[in-house]
Regions:
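Hydrophobic faces of well-ordered beta-strands that scaffold small-molecule active sites
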Residues: 48-53, 74-77, 106-111
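Ser/Thr/Pro/Gly-rich low-complexity, intrinsically disordered segments
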Residues: 3-5
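Short, Lys/Arg-enriched N-terminal segments with co-localized hydrophobic residues
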Residues: 11-29
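Glycine-rich, proline-tolerant flexible connector loops at the mouths of alpha/beta enzymes
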Residues: 51, 72-89
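N-terminal active-site wall of soluble small-molecule enzyme domains
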Residues: 37, 59, 82-122
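N-terminal amphipathic alpha-helix/helix-capping segment at the start of soluble metabolic enzymes
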Residues: 29-50
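Generic structural signal for hydrophobic
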Residues: 42, 67, 121-122
Length: 122
């Protein structure tokens, strides 16, 4: 139980959060998935995965919202200039927070990384 009084129950690809004050409401939480996992499923299923560059939180939210409307997995891409403006940690936290609320798989991808060090940090 966390400080909000919620109980977490883990499943294979998601967590179910049950509010102790209202057991009838459940919220599914989808964590970030790896691009490898996402692309292997797409290859096996015979479908493509959209990958979109997002420069800020509003773009991340809009991309995930569109993916949810289409019931499709989505790859959020960032660039070296975007993570230089903020930080890798900040950008990853934004995407992870939005992915946690999503009903579809979301992964994060560093597009056109400029160095090995940045790729390892990402």
């Amino acid at each position: 139980m966390n400080s909000n009084g919620n109980v977490s129950v883990s499943g294979p690809n998601e967590k179910i959060i049950q509010n102790k004050h209202n057991d009838s409401k459940e919220e599914k939480i989808m964590p970030l998935v790896t691009s490898k996992e996402m692309l292997l499923k797409a290859q096996k299923g015979g479908y493509a995965v959209g990958a979109f560059n997002a420069e800020n939180m509003e773009m991340v939210k809009a991309i995930i919202q569109a993916a949810e409307e289409l019931k499709a997995p989505v790859m959020i891409q960032t660039t070296p200039s975007t993570v230089k403006y903020g930080t890798v940690e900040t950008y990853a936290a934004i995407v992870a927070a939005e992915a946690a609320k999503a009903s579809v798989p979301v992964c994060l991808h560093l597009d056109h990384g400029s160095s090995f060090e940045l790729a390892m940090q990402a």
